[in-house]
Amino acid sequence: MPLANTEGGLSISLFRGAKAAAESGGFRTHVLHDRVTRASAFLFDSTADAVAFSRWIEPQVVPMRDWLAGEPIGGLSKHAKLRELETHVVGPTCHVLYAYTTGDAVGMNMITRNSYALNQGFVLENAPVKPKRAVLEGNMGGDKKPSHRYFERGGHGKTVIAECTLTEEAVRRVLKTTLDDLAALAFVGTHGAIASGMQSVAFTPATAIAALFIATGQDVGMVGTSSMAHGTAHKVDGGLHATIRLPGLEVATIGGGTTLPSANAWLSLLDCAGAGRVYRFAQIVAAATLALEISASAAMSTAGSENFYKAHFERGGLR
């Protein structure tokens, strides 16, 4: 697992979590949704005009697809497929969320080009109610900003779940803790996240995701949204069932930084380089994130969090 990081103990901790899962039957992963959004905004003189515009544009998805497919405008992406749109009227402004699939690329440049072309060549030309202003991104698209909307519903990136059932033996021997201690920490951590208004319900998802992103040429500006996470852990017969849900994982196996020699080499090592491999890579990222969650939580769950303290004291270095 390629990890680019400067945190002492991160790699060995992640691998410890992976070892515990492997000895318990391994991870299971699922890709639930795949969308990337660009949220344009159209400003009117009145709320009534914004509502009328909303009612006109909502049924236009199929005509928009046909227009994009047949439009000879240079620079349009044929890989960005418009799947749906959604409107939100706020006063005299109508926000229009274009939702695309973008194949094996993250696709923000693709959907920027296509959304701009739609706004200029289709919407402004055909809308029965003309807006005063059109803005390509009205800040509802979720790009590089964690938000409650995309944490709850997904829809900006891939929604991926990883799960495993840890055996009592693996928890005791590999993780050096107990099922009861892990379950108790999960309870405490969930309530702590809620009480603090945290965007995620998890322990340390950004750590694994950032390390993987840097190693494999992903856009590190998307670590924040990609590491929104909802973890669960509960006791089952003879073990502990653990999951992590990443509702906005933005990853690619083609384009951008993935073409750099070192990044491409690491993606190739994971059998994730090139077209047709992005879902595999997304599932590996989710599994790696869960592996670190398991190990770090195990260290924190010991009496007085002694193992967590020792790991950071011994591997973090003295200052």
Protein language model features and the residues they cover:
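A structural-propensity feature for long, helix-poor, extended segments
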Residues: 16-65, 145-187, 231-286
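Structural motif
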Residues: 39-41, 93-95, 132-135, 221, ...
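Generic hydrophobic alpha-helical scaffold/packing signal
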Residues: 210-213, 267, 286, 298
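Extended hydrophobic packing segments that form well-structured cores
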Residues: 274-319
